């Protein structure tokens, strides 16, 4: 069954786009309607395509545990395995509350193209607390998204166009519809098809090494010696929508 965004989410996303334009000193075009964007609508691969091990992470840019994984565990995996050609990595969106903001932040990343996508992901996670704190303020998180987009070459109108892009919304819907059933929280990490529940660095190394050298040693357990890292539940499906957040007011 194809996952669909509830209508209130689409309305909230449209409201975000209007608020983005309101951030422009000149007012901008009608919610970025005339802006030219070329979003990437495919997996963005970090690393060499020929790498023998593939890590897929289902993540959300509003998920605190995803942010912790990206900042604490992932840099060492990148240095040891991705930068050395042994592993390639792909992030797939699985929005968590507030889902509209998660989708909007992902849209900004996708609009910067393959070469800058992960730079924006890192920028969002670097400014995670600022973005999330702003989301509950009167102006909302829109100014933070505009700042992030601007640092990576997007105009205010382009950010607005990205946020309202139906093509991006449809692509994220497709990602959700095609995810494995066990991917119902974030981060969900999959290594060469194996769901790894303990996402701490030492365990990830064991799993990766077992994939790189099959038969060299018994396959490691993916159960944690202690409590497994926490995850964030994915956003509620369309059949059980949560109350939408108040849209940030437009600046007169």
Kindly label every feature range from the protein language model:
Residues 36-53:
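A short beta-strand-turn-helix
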Residues 6-13:
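Sec-dependent signal peptide recognition
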Residues 51-54, 85, 104, 185-187:
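Envelope-exposed proteins and targeting segments
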Residues 49-70, 89-90:
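Short active-site neighborhood of thiol/selenol oxidoreductases, capturing the structured segment around
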Residues 2-6, 26, 30-32, 60, ...:
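C-terminal cap of thioredoxin/glutaredoxin-like
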Residues 68-150:
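Structural alpha/beta surface segment adjacent to cysteine/selenocysteine redox centers
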Residues 19-22:
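C-terminal motif of bacterial Sec signal peptides marking the signal peptidase cleavage site
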